[in-house]
Amino acid sequence: MISRPILALAAASFGIGTTEFVIMGLLPDVAGSLHVTIPQAGYLVSGYAMGVVVGAPIVAIATAGLPRKTALLALMAVFIIGNLGCALAPTYGLLMAARILTAFAHGAFFGIGAVVASDLVAREQRAQAISLMFAGLTLANVLGVPFGTALGQAAGWRAAFWAVVAIGVIAGLAIIRYIPTGLPGSRGGLAREFRALGRWPALLPMVISTLASVSMFSLFTYITPLLEDVTGISPRGVTGVLLMIGIGLTVGNLLGGRLADRNLLRTLVGGFAGLIAVLVVLFFASRSIVPTLPLLILWGGLAFALVSPLQIWVVDAATDAPNLASTLNQGAFNLGNATGAWLGGVALTAGASYRQLPLLGALVAAIALAFTLTTLVNPRVMPVQIRPAD
């Protein structure tokens, strides 16, 4: 299962995940170097996220006619150039432009990469293959971001982006060497692809993907103040908790892929139900570190166990437009990231406490579960390839 082509995709995934999140640990350094405030530097995070959302459909359309290996290499070239721009940017505006350029490669790479990963294995192993590719993203949170932050703080923030450039070059060479040629691009014209995506069976998993991400990031965005102000953990202790959550994300992602290959709908229903239960318990238990730590690890695992099942569902629901559908689903995840952060902020501004944010995440997860359960009422909305047997 862990083949060299999938490892090549995972290496690229690791680089993309590192460049997306490493900036968060370097905001004070960037702000001081470019003479902007820390909140202004923070826009480099949201600017990247919106670049993914906006760029995903544009790049998917632009690469629709390319063979998939060629498309992946073109996207890695954009990724490398964008990070070179970040490393060399003399001004805040140019750094923002380079971040957005880099983000344009993000959604399409994960989208096309997921299709390629699923095509490289037997049908009963597709979700596992996608989860292995996404393991690069989760490992970026566990290893890449802490290492990149430490490197940037020790050698200057630009050094972190030079390191990401090196990762991108290595991943690009691995794609050249190990991804097979001859993988087709689009199976039809753009009009046909958009018609396929305009049907509810293709839109439903994207709606659920967005809601799953909103649920996660309405809490994750504010996890540090929750741990410090509610649980009473020191700033140094928060770093350790985030590392443990990252391990939970990685394990949950891999386990979700394995379970989804057995029964996709049961994996999603169980994942959302477990997520709701954990978040409700976290609301009551968050004042003590003893229950909070295992609950947060479990929460991260359950949240990322949903990723590969939803990605497979989207690909199978839009067989006439797998690249575009898979890429747009990555845009849906990132739209959920931004929306979740905004929704959590709205709740806090309205008077909610950090302790109450898990309840907000549970509410959104319950809505996602309700949409998922509609497939039991109308099984036809789920592709026959992944529909449970009667």
Which residues make up each language-model segment?
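Helix-breaking motifs and short loop linkers at transmembrane-helix boundaries and internal kinks
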Residues: 35, 67, 88-94, 232, ...
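Conserved MFS/SLC helix-loop-helix module at the cytosolic interface between two early adjacent transmembrane helices
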Residues: 54-93
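Helix-to-loop junctions at the C-terminal end of transmembrane segments
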Residues: 56-67, 252-264, 348-349
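Paired small-residue
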Residues: 78, 82-85, 93-102, 290-298
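Helix-loop-helix hairpin linking two adjacent transmembrane segments in secondary transporters
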Residues: 94, 122-177, 222, 226
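Cytoplasmic helix-loop-helix junction between adjacent transmembrane helices
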Residues: 98-136
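Intracellular juxtamembrane helix-capping segments at the cytosolic ends
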Residues: 109-121, 305-318
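C-terminal transmembrane helical hairpin of 12-TM major facilitator-type secondary transporters
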Residues: 266-310
